[in-house]
Every structure is written in C-alpha cells, then in structure tokens.
Swiss-Prot record:
Residues 791-824 are annotated as: Disordered. One of its GO terms (cellular component) is mitochondrion. Glycans are attached at N844, N874, N955, N1002, N1170, N1360, N1579, N1761. It comes from Saccharomyces cerevisiae (strain ATCC 204508 / S288c). GO terms for biological process: (1->3)-beta-D-glucan biosynthetic process; ascospore wall assembly; fungal-type cell wall polysaccharide biosynthetic process. This is 1,3-beta-glucan synthase component FKS3.
Amino acid sequence: MDFMSPKFSLTDVEYPAWCQDDEVPITMQEIREIFVELMDKFGFQKSSMENMYQHLMGQLDSRASRTGAQNALVSLHVSYIGGEHANYRKWYFAAQLDLDEEIGFQNMRLHGKARQRNVKMAKKRGVSIKEQIKQWNEKEQEFINNHPKITLTQEQLEDQTNLKSADYKWKLKMKKLTPENMIRQLALYLLCWGEANQVRFAPECLCFIFKCALDYDISTSSSEKTVKSPEYSYLNDVITPLYEFLRGQVYKKDAKGNWKRREKDHKNIIGYDDINQLFWYPEGFERIILNNGERLVDKPLEERYLYFKDVAWSKVFYKTYRETRSWKHCFTNFNRFWIIHFAPFWFFTTFNSPTLYTKNYIQLLNNQPTPQVRLSVIAFGGTIACLVQILATVFEWGFVPREWPGAQHLSSRMIGLLFCLAINLGPSVYVLGFFEWDVHSKSAYIVSIVQLIIAFLTTFFFAVRPLGGLFRPYLNKDKKHRRYISSQTFTASFPKLTGRSKWFSYGLWVFVYLAKYIESYFFLTLSLRDPIRVLSIMDLSRCQGEYLLGPILCKWQAKITLVLMLLSDLGLFFLDTYLWYIICNCIFSIVLSFSLGTSILTPWKNVYSRLPKRIYSKILATSEMDVKFKAKILISQVWNAIVISMYREHLLSIEHLQRLLFQQVDSLMGDTRTLKSPTFFVAQDDSTFKSMEFFPSNSEAKRRISFFAQSLATPISEPVPVDCMPTFTVLVPHYSEKILLGLKEIIREESPKSKITVLEYLKHLHPTEWECFVKDTKLLSMEKSFLKEAESSHDEDRLEIPDALYDPRSSPLSDHTESRKLPTEDDLIKEKINDLPFSYFGFNSSEPSYTLRTRIWASLRTQTLYRTLSGFMNYSKAIKLLYRIENPSLVSLYRGNNEALENDLENMASRKFRMVVAMQRYAKFNKDEVEATELLLRAYPNMFISYLLEELEQNESEKTYYSCLTNGYAEFDEESGLRKPIFKIRLSGNPILGDGKSDNQNHSIIFYRGEYIQVIDANQDNYLEECLKIRSVLSEFEELELNPTIPYIPGIEYEEEPPPIAIVGSREYIFSENIGVLGDIAAGKEQTFGTLFARTLAEIGGKLHYGHPDFLNGIFMTTRGGLSKAQRGLHLNEDIYAGMNAICRGGKIKHSDYYQCGKGRDLGFGSILNFTTKIGAGMGEQLLSREYYYLGTQLPMDRFLSFFYAHPGFHLNNLFISFSVQLFFVLLLNLGALNHEIIACFYDKDAPITNLETPVGCYNIQPALHWVSIFVLSIFIVFFIAFAPLLIQEVLEKGIWRAASRFLHHLLSMAPLFEVFVCQVYSNSLLMDLTFGGAKYISTGRGFAITRLDFFTLYSRFVNISIYSGFQVFFMLLFAIISMWQPALLWFWITVISMCFAPFIFNPHQFAFMDFFIDYKTFIHWLFSGNTKYQKESWANFVKSSRSRFTGYKSKTVDDISEDSGHDSKKARFWNVFFAELFLPFCVFLFNFTAFSFINAQTGVSDSTPTSAVFRLLLVTFLPIFLNSIVLFLLFWVSLFVVPGLSYCCKDAGAVIAFIAHTFSVLVYLLDFELMWFLQGWNFTRTLILLITCINMHLILFKVFTTIFLTREYKNNKAHLAWWNGKWYNTGMGWSIILQPIREYFVKIMESSYFAADFFLGHFLLFIQTPIILLPFIDYWHTMVLFWMNPRSIIAHKRILTRKQRALRSRIVSKYFSLYFVMLGVLLFMLIAPFFAGDFVSSPQELLEGTLFEGIFQPNNQNNNDTGPNAPSTILTTTPTLPTFRTVA
C-alpha cells in the first residue's frame, strides 16, 4: 500500500480544527516529518507509522475542535506524558526514575539481593554508595535553596515521599518543551505503543521502553550524523523477545513443530502482570541483565535502549503474586466479611445457649451459668476475629513472594495480631481455667466484663480496618525510602467518594447490617435457643449401639445433630446478609430512580407533552446556531427522522406513521403552508385522545419512544455543537458469531428435531412487523412489475402509476381503483394464492434482492452482527442529522447540490465517529461469511475491519502474522475475494495467547480514533433516537471544557484535579425478553444487573466494567493496560479486570441512566447455562487474581462491602445456598434417625421449661423439629428474593400491571425450577474451577432454542453438575419425610424436581410421544455404544472424560481419531481435590453413617443384642464390587484369547463382552438393593438410610482410588477398546502395554458400578416422565408454557415427514415402547415386592439364628418404649434443690 499516494494523504478537510487554526503551534507537515524521522531512527514499520500519525492527528483535531490547537496539544501531552493523572508521570515518580536520572539505580540503597549486588558492583567501580547519596542530598538541598518557590518544612525535607522538589524539576523540564518536543514525545510514545503487541498489556513495561527510547532520542537529536535503523528493528529487538518469553510461559513446541499449551497453572506462569510489576520498583530494573551478565542499570541512560536486544529476559522475570488455586484467597481477600459474620454469630448464639456452659445443668431447675463464665464465653468472639486475621496473614505469606519489593511486612503485623489474640484469649484462660464454672469470682467477673468490651472493640476494629493497613498503613510506612509509592499508585489510588455518594454508601451498609443483625437475632438465633437446650441435655445412654463400635457413637447422636444444626444456622446467617443487601439495594435504587426521574411512576414529569421542548433543549445545541429558526421546525426534523427510521425498520405501519409525523398543511389563509404537530404529544395527557392508536399493540416502537421521552425528562448534560464534540470509536470484537442469516437457515427447520422454522418463529414473535414488511415487499414487487411492463410496452401513461409508490403516505394505485372492475371471486382467490409466498417467505421471486430483504428482516430480529452494525452505524446518521439541523446555512451554501452537501455531512460523521469491527478470522472466512461481510462493507463503506493475516514467508517454517485494517473503500483483491488492507502491521507472532477476545481487542485497539471507545458485543443493537444523545453521554467524561491554563509552570500550587472518568456505563435493554420463559429470565437478570444495580453501584463507587455498551476513556485505558486483561483462563471474564484496574489506578466509573443500547441474551436452557458456567468459572479465576487481593485488603469498609456483594458475594452466596441445603439434608438424616428411634414427649410450647416432661424418660425433640420449618422458610425467602429486583425494575420501568403480569408469567412457566437449577450451576462451576481449574470460554448459542435435544445429551451434560446430587437430595428428603414428617419439607420437592428434571422440563418438545420413545432408543444406544470403535457420543467416552478431571491426560499420542476431542484437562493438584472431592464427601459419608448407626442402635429396646450394622454396610457395598471384579477378570481372558478370533466373523464381539459385563453389573446392583431390604428386616426407613450410606461409601471409595492410585489417561481410547476386543497388540502404547491392562481392570471395576448407577438413574428419570407423556395435547401445552406461544401458532406448524420416515419412526417406537414398559415393569416389581415380602419372610434373622452371621440382620417391629412405667429409675421426676454459687475474690 503506497501511503505517499494522494489517495491517502491527509488534507485540511480531514483535520480542519487543527489545520485551519491560525495559531496552530506546529503544522501537519512538520508533524509528519517528526514521525518519519522517528521511524527511520528506531526502525518502526512504515504502516504502523502512518497509522499512528493518523491516530495522533485524529486526537489533536478532536481536542482542537473545542479548545484551539495550542491548548489541544498541551492537553494531549498532559494526558499522555506530563499531567498529574498521566500514567507515565505517575510511573516516573513511583518507580523513582527521577532518582535514576540524578544518582542512578546502581548508586541507590535498594532492598534484598539488589542491595547486595549494588554494593558489590560499587566496590568494583571503586565508588561508595553512601558517598554518592550524600553528594546527591547536598545537590538537592542546593537546588531547593536556589529556588525559593519550593517551600518545604523540616518534616517534608526528611520525608522522601514528598515530591515537591521533584515535581518542581518535572514542571521545569516540561515547561522547556517546545511544541515540536511535545509532538516528538507523543509520537514516540504512540509509535512504541502501536507496535508493542502483547506488551500493551504491561503499561509500565511500555513506559520503561519509551523512557529508554526517549533518552536515546534526546542524546542523538543533537548529533549531526543521521541515525537510521532498518524497518522492523523496534519489533525484532525490543518487542519480540518479550513476546517470545510470554508465549513460552504458556506454549511449547511439540515434535511436529506445532505450538501446544503447557500444563501449568497460573501460579507457575509468569504472566502480563508479573512482567509489568517488575517495572514498578528500582529493584526490578536492577534485575535486568544482559546475555553477557552485565546489568542494564550500569549502562548510561542514553545507551540503554540499544541494549534491549541483548537482555536475557528469561533470567529477569519472576512471580510477583502466586495465583494458587485455593480457597485461602477468600480468607485473605475477604477477611472482613468473615469477621462480621463469624464474630456476631458467636456473640448471638453463645448468649442464647447457656446450657452449653452451665455446670450440672438440670432441666427441671433451668439453672443458669455464673455471670463471668457467660461473659467470657461470649467474649471468645474477639478471639475468633483474631484467628481470622492470623489465618488471613499466614495465607498472605504464601500468595505474595517476599522477594517482591511491594510485598507488605507481615512479621510486625503478625506480632500485633498475636498480641491481640493474647489479650482476647488470656482472660478466658483466667476465668474458665482458674475457677470452677459454678464458682462466682468478683475478679473474674470484672475481667470478663473487660474481656467482652475488648472483644467488641477488637471485632469492630478488625471489621473496619483493611488488612493492608491494619495497625498502620503500610503504604505510608518507610517514608525515608519512598518504598511503597508504586503500590499506592497502581493498586490503591481509589477515587474518594464525596457528597451524596459518600453518605449514600455509608447509609446503605448501615441499613443492611442493622436490619441483618436485628433479623438474624430475633428470627435465626432465638429460634435456635430451644433446640440447643433440648439437644445439648438429651441423654441417649439407653441405646444398644453396634456390635463393633458399641454404644460409643449412638450416645453422641444428639450432640452430632446439634453441631449440624449450628452449622446450618451459620449458613443461614451468611445467606440473610445477601438477602438484606438485595432489599436495601432495591430500595436505594428506587430512591435514585425517582430522584433522577427515570421511573414511569413519576407523573409530575409530563413526559410526552413536554417532549418537543426537551428535544429542543437537550438534543439540539441551538445556542451557537448561525441562523435562528423557529424551534418547531428544528424539532420536527428530529422527530420525523426518528419515526421514519422506525417505519423503515417495519416497526410502524403507514397509518401509524401518518399520525406521528409533523406534517405541512395549508394555513387558514391558504397562501402559506404551516407545520402541524402530531396529536401524539397531547394525547398522552388528554383522556379524549385515548382511543387513538399511535402504535401497534405491545410494539417495539412504543417501547423505544417511551424510553426516549422518559430519558429526556432526566438531568442530561447540555450538548455541544457537532463540530465541537469529541471523536469516538465503536469497537466490536467478532470471532465466529453469525453475520447475516442465510436463506436456508430461516426457511428450513434448524434440525430434524425442530418443529418450527426460524422465520415462522420470528413471524409469531413480531406479527405486526411482518405485516408491515410484507406490505412493503408487495409494493416493491408491484413497482418492479409496473416498470417491466412499461419498458416492454413503451406506454408512457403506465409509467405514471409507480410514482405513487414512492410516497409512503399515499395508497398504492388509489387513483385507479375507480376505473378498474370490481374483482370477481376467482380474482380474489387468485390474489390470495399469489400472496401466499409473501405471507410465508416475504418474497415471491427467487431474485437475490428479494431473498436478501427477508434475510435482512430476520437478521435484524435475531442476534447477528448485521443487527449490531446497522444499529451502531446510526451514530453516523445521528451526527449528520444534527449537523444539518444545527447548521441550516449549509443547505443554502450548497444551493441544491445534494451530493456536495452529503459529502460535507459524511466528512463530519467520519471525523467524529469510527466503527471498527475486530474480525479476527476475516482472512479465513468461508464463502458465506465473505459474502455477508461484503454486503456490510457495501452498505457501510465507512466501517473499518481489523483482522489477522497469516503469511508463510519463503524459506521459513514459521508463519508471519500481521494486524490489518480495511474498509469499504479499499481495493478488492480478486485472488482472495477480500478487500486489500489499508494498514498491514507485522506482529511478533500469533497474538492470540489468551482466551481470544482480549487478544482480538488488543491487536485492533491501535486502529481506534479519537478520545473515547465504546466497546460492544456482536449481539447488540442501537437506535437512532439513542444515538442522538451521544454528545451528552460523551460529556459525562467531564473533559469537554479543557482547562486553558498550562499546568507546567513550576512553583504554582494548582487546584487538586478531580479523578479522571475512566468508564461511563450505560443501560441495556434486553431485546430477547418476552420470547419464552428462559429468554425472559435471562433478559430480566441482565436488565436488573445492568440497570437497577448498576445505578446504585455507580453512585456508591462499586460499579466495575462489564463490557457491553460502556464508553471508555481511550487515553486513560490504553496507557494503563488496555480494554481488558488477557492471561488465558485467569482473565476469562476479561472486561471486569479493566474496571478493577481503572479503580485501583484512580479512575472513576460512572453510570448513565438516560442512554441505553439493545442487547441479546441466551435463549435456550443449554446456552444460558453455558453462560452461567462461564461466569461462575470466571469468578473462580477472579478469586485467585491479584486485583481481588488489592481491593479486598485495601478498600475502605463501605467500598469493600459494595465491591464484595456486587461481585464475588453473589457467587459465594450461591455456593452457601448449595452447601446449606446439602448440610441441612445431612442434618435431616440425623434428626430423622433420632426422631424415628425415640419416644417423643408431649409438647406444649407455652408450658414452663421447668415442667416435668411426660411420659417420664421421653425425649423432647419437638423444638428441633419446629426449627426445621424456620430453616425451610429462610431458604424459601432466599430463593425467591432472586425475583425481587426484576419485579421492582418492572414496576419502575413499566408500571405495576406489567410487573405483575411478567411475574405471573414466570411463576406459571415454572421459572422457580430454573432459578434453583441456575443456583446449582453457579455454585458447581465455581467449586469445580477452584478444584480442577480449566476455566475456558464457552461459546453460547445466540439463536432460538426451538430444537429438541436428546435425552442422553442433557443427561451427560448435567448429571455431574446437578442430577447426581439431586438424587442424593431426593433420597435424603424421602427419608426425612417418612422419619420426621414436617409440612415445610414439601418445599424441597421443588428443589429435587429442579435439580433432577429441569433440563428435561425446559427441553422443547420433551413430551412429544413418538420423540420420547425414539429418545429412549438413542439413550440405550448411548449407554452400550463406544465399545468396539470410538464414538464421541457414548457413555464410555462420557465416563472417561469425567474421570480425566482427576487424572489428567498423558502427553503421548498415537494419531488416533479419538485424540481429537479437545482433551485439555490438566491433572488437578491433590490438595485442591482433597478438600472438594475427598474431604467434603467423607464428611457427608461420616454424618450419613452416624444416622445409619443410630437408627440401627435399638434405642430403648431392652434385653437386645447389638447387631453388626457396620458389617451389613460393608457387605452391601463391597459385594457388587467383588462380583463385578470376578466377572471382569473372567471376561478379560475371554476377550484376550477368544474375541480376536471371533472378530473376523463377528465384528461386534467386543460389544457383546461389554454388554455382558454391564448387564451383569445392573443385575448385581438390583439384587444388592433387594438384599438391603432383606438385611434391614423389610423396614423401608432403615433400608433407605442404608442405601444412602452405601451410595456415599461407593463415592468416597472410588474418588479416593481415582485420585491417589490411578495414573493419567491416554488421550485415545485404544486401551478401553482393547479391554473388550483383546487387541492389545495394535494400541501403539509401547512398553506401557504391560501394565496398562492392570490399570484398565481397576477402571472397569469402577465403570461397572458407574454404569449401573447411570442405567438406573436414566431409567428413573424417564419413568417419572411416563404419566406426563400420556396426557393428551401435552406437547402443545408444554410448548405454550416454554415459548409463550399462541396455541394456534403451535398447531399450525407441524413437521412434514415422508412416508419412509414415518414408517421408520413407527417401527422404532413400537420396538422401544415394548422394551421401555418391560423395563418399567421389572423395576417397579423389584421396588414394590419388598413391601409385601414381610408377609412371607417376617423375621429374616431367624434364617441364620445361631450362626456367625446372626447379627447381620436388623430386627424389626421391636418394642422400644422404655418411658413412663418402663423408664429407668435414674431419671429425675422431682425438682431438686437449686444449687448455690460459691463466691470467691
């Protein structure tokens, strides 16, 4: 590309604000010469130079347009280099570069090993560091003395963090800069940045490169000799070595020369942040060594740049923060969260549980503990707070390497914490250890009071103070050495809240915690008081126990139940905080909404009647108009443009358009024409107009106009003239998202399992818009046909007819209706027949122009890139419209030359707005994608496309990568079929090192223009009326009025500048709402998060950046690391890191409530949960990140809570819900077992505690059972609070009626089931990520979810996530209901149904009769396939991939097809797996076992012998495993010696062997279940607890074996196939073939058990659905509920099948219908038979009486009533005397 050609030269037209300024400080030509000179000197690429030249000129022009050229240059230099908020200046002082220039890093007293090396090198040079520092101090003092404007006190002189003198020197240096110098510095920085590639993610590293380059440039500028470097020198010498180091951390080359990912977790990867943080401290610079061992700091400043190519980067970098995959991060980062929950919970609970610490408590007396014991025990809460802080500090030691200079000093903090622990714990030792608990001591009482006060103070202090500045802020420490300025600057420069925001923040959290503590105390803690009392004193010594264990375990059953109850209550204590946060946040958001006027419930705003005036005052900048017009004329142009745009989008019919337009009508005098306003503005406030319809019912047009009017009633910044507005860019990342729907995609079913086409579904969703579209198309068709007829007959009269077609307000052919004959019936029928293609497809001709219209219509109503770009290109239309309206002299200037006028408008739009689509794959697009892209480029030629180009250079094996830019005006390359690049910038290598999106944004960011960037996803939309507000939105950055004073005058105390606005967020309208329950739920959540919560969070400083429609300050963000972060996995939710980075570095984030964009959301069950999984896993990665560490340990208390509950708190809350429910069910097992085996007392809640409980010897368990109802109510509220924000948002936005309607729709559509399931997915994805890692980008479906998914697909996708645990909950719930019936437990059936059946309930057409049985066939096939050849969709593959999470994969491959399944599982660390997958399941098993042992302990049965419950459990657990192992052992030899021979005649011999093994396992487990009944004496309750315990024992055994003993998996499935077919010889495994069969043997033993479980579970899920599929018309009702479709629409769209297809389906259904019901009958019989078996074998134990196995049976129907007359004599029946306390000093 020839940049010197006139075609690409920059002219005055392109940058008029700069070029036409009379006082321009430097001309464009001079600027260009500077760029060229720098390019030659440093070896920058020519293409990059041209790009950066245009970039700088665009920014200069943007600022000059509103402030003048001189001020524009200075302000830009201030923003990039020299200003108070410029990142370069901050870094320069933070990293002590000023001292490097004056004394040199090599002569400074550094820390750690850097100090030793400095001393050693100083000795070599023969200088003294001490002497050097002394000389510098003398020079510094001399400088201060010579400049009287520097006024420093003695304290400031000693304080080296005081930068007054350094600032003075800096300003002195800046003041000396000429405009040429400023441009040179800006140009050099931009050129360095423009080719920095991945180094752009390390802003301080880039600053260092720029600093070295600047020093070199300054030193060589004065020399007469011209310094030149070859092109690509900068890239090859400076950037590529750094890139190669970064790439080498994540990838390595395999034997074939391909780059493969390393199996390293984040803590072992030196990432972008680690590299960047090296450049924060002098100690980091000192580490930079060259290949010859010399240090870079020992080289002169002006020569350092030349040595970059010799730096040994691999020896320089190290980890500055360890992202260890551990829950410990949560303890350190959120220590205050734990303190404000653990300590108050302890205070509340211990105060209300005196029985736990009362010596010799007797219920008949209800004697109380001594006061000092009570106070001391309560005061232990302070000790808990200390322990939390100590643990947080210990864990911090592991995260932050001590060698990093920014690491906090933890030793002194630990000493302080140990002291706090001592003063909190010491009194308890004195009070509880030195005195008996029934002795009253005055001294101990005083000590306990003081201890309690100290505990409260300690808890409050630790709760409020950030961990990073616990006893004294570490950032202010060590002032004499400027040590921690970098940490302050880059991690803790949080913008302060002021005024309303500050009090809002304080108020919110005071209200939340006040309400929380009051509610928790009275509702949670007081309800626990009685259960604690009854369980803590319950004596279970009358249980017989177990043969092996005796009564040891059963005696403690009440205490075990109490511990579980306390833990469950603690879970609720955490949960209800989030509940109150939601409630208070909603209330505060309502208050904000009313104060801003954004609510529909603010009638005083006169939204519609004042709309014209508001358009005039808030949309138009009329103050500087050159010609004054009546306001009405200007308003009409804006309003008509808006409604006509809606008409063109087919949102309005011609009739509606006529009612909404401003129209010219004849005046009463008749000689002039006047402008008539539409009655619409008056109608909304006047009841007489209510009958008039201005919009179609429930139309998109009405919603848009309504929001537009509402938004203009809110406070909006006054717009500046168009030519003064800042330039901005819209950036749209695109990978493989749909660009434009193809014809086949919209008129054919998505798959054979869809029953409706996309077009039909769209017609159902948008009936009015389709009608308008069809009318429009018919008019166009008629017009073309008239033209054709006219051309063929040359009849001029006929040519007049189409003229009417061009006027949308006239009816077609209206003048000819009278002359035509009335149509006959045949004519009408013929006309209807001719109209059929229009109504069905939108066209009646296969011409591309017609089909394209239908494709575009459909694409504009789905989530396509075409919709996004057509929406956001409205900015261009809006700018042109506003410019033309506000500059009426333009029209007269061009005097009817519309083309010239249009060119002028186009130039203005191009100056102020640029659209960049980051089409990463553009060069690899297929034919359809290229065609769609070309269509876009022709429609919007000003749209730019950035993309990656790969070229294989001659004689080189490595590909060369280029970052390219093109647009619709670029030349067409006939060879590739693509546009030729305008810019082609070589990269160091493949830029996609991370998850993709961040890297794509990063390589494209160099092509942005202007000052601001709006980041958009490829599934959004925008509207003309919203684009008209762009000037007001950009003014939110508070940079429109630039300060004309030059900030570089030394000695002047400038006013403190407010923090820069980094991000301006905006609202989202989710256009995928109201199209089915799932789409509406997803839309509602996104809407509330993006609007309701964002409004409050922005006000209280808790809002971050969530991508989507936010506007970013281009200079602020690009000089601080870019738009997002990009380390693979760690930065999966990449956008939020930009927000955290901005907050940490002093940027402010705002929210604009008056501007909104459209946004699409996932619509199907699977795609929504894919998104949920991505977000949950991404949060797991965020918890490990250093940003969370900085925010969690340094934010003030109120800001910390805002950050926590808005981000990690939401996900941890889901985890707490999941854990609380699981813990509660384990409690129910133990409480149910207790209730089942004891004789309960008669309970009267109003009776005094001291009354004798009857019958004598009974157990008072009713308070504990009552507490269960309270727990269930709490969980119910916590679940349903998820609907509150959406409900409130709907009330505010659309009114009470619409809100109630939407909420009712959700309830009737079973939305609560979906909410429960989503909660489970969130918690599972978070837990799994922190256990196994492997978070990755999951592409979510953006199409309509109208396709039925197979049962096995849903089963395999969700069984590990929810269905397995759902069935465990089902069994536990069933046990709880039959052992301790409570009506409240019925709520949990919703949980069970959701966890087990939600995937099937929300599957389209799940209950279609024939499809259901065809599904059964595919499920059976899935179970038994994959054993003779590799099948991706098979149970064998599913179970292997599930296992690989624990084992990981071997790196060895044999080029087998089975290795292409995306195996990227890393082997998880043992200690990560230990907690989540071993310890927690073991705890569940342990508590299951306590319930199991107690229910078999024969409590209250006299003269009985303990049974062998443990042996019984071991028998039913190991018997099927043992039998399976024998069968597998025998089948192995059969497969080894028999199957290879049989395979020649019977290809499926291996499958037969697998079938035998798996079928045998199913039968064995079926018999094992019957054996459980038999051994438990046909008692269903006891059998159920044995089954539950057996399942958990299986789980823990298999997980332990898999984790500890199993080696890694091969990526191929050769070993699996060889096990069944015996062909081990061709597996390609080498010598490992010897031991592989042994490994496979143990794997197959476990797989046999897993197979049986999946077989039974799958069938159970299907059998439960049987009654539903037999209901008449169930498919229609189900579809109506899911998609909110009209029943008529459902019936109208039946899939048409051929006769052959119908016959095949019938055969399959008849065959598998029979199999299905046979299986159902067998399993039902095996389940029901044991209920009646007791009638035939009533006492199984008699069969083995007198033998060794006699105790293996559990007796049934025993008399366990040992109360009343049978009660032991040891039980108190009379009230004893009250013991008196002994009093001592």
